[in-house]
Structure formats: structure tokens, C-alpha cells
Amino acid sequence: MAVPKKRTSISKKRIRKNIWKLKGHWAAKKAISLAKSISTGNSKSFFVQQTSNKVLE
């Protein structure tokens, strides 16, 4: 099994952790943006089937 030769420095570990956090942040931001555009009906990249709210009599 491969074993690292030296310990990773604290600064390098912090940089990698921040990059990992930022990827999640941007993914969440894109998801919220898409949800907002779908809810307002302004989405150009996501197709939603519209349902009618007619009352059955």
C-alpha cells in the first residue's frame, strides 16, 4: 500500500480544505439560482411540465 513519505504542511492542508469548501459553495449557489429561476418561470435551461390548477366539478 502506498504511504506518503512526509507530512503535509498545515498551510497546504488548509488550502486544499478551502478549495474543497468552495466547490461545495459554488454547487449550492448554482442549485439555488436554478431553483429560483424555475419557481419564477424564467428558466431557459431547465424544462418543467406545467400542471393546471383547475378544480374538477
Swiss-Prot record:
One Gene Ontology biological process: translation
Listed SUPFAM superfamilies: Zn-binding ribosomal proteins (SSF57829)
Cysteines engaged in disulfide bonds, as pairs: none
Annotated Gene Ontology cellular component terms: chloroplast; large ribosomal subunit
Main location, first listed in the record: plastid
Domain of life: Eukaryota
Annotated protein name in UniProt: Large ribosomal subunit protein bL32c
Organism the protein comes from: Nandina domestica
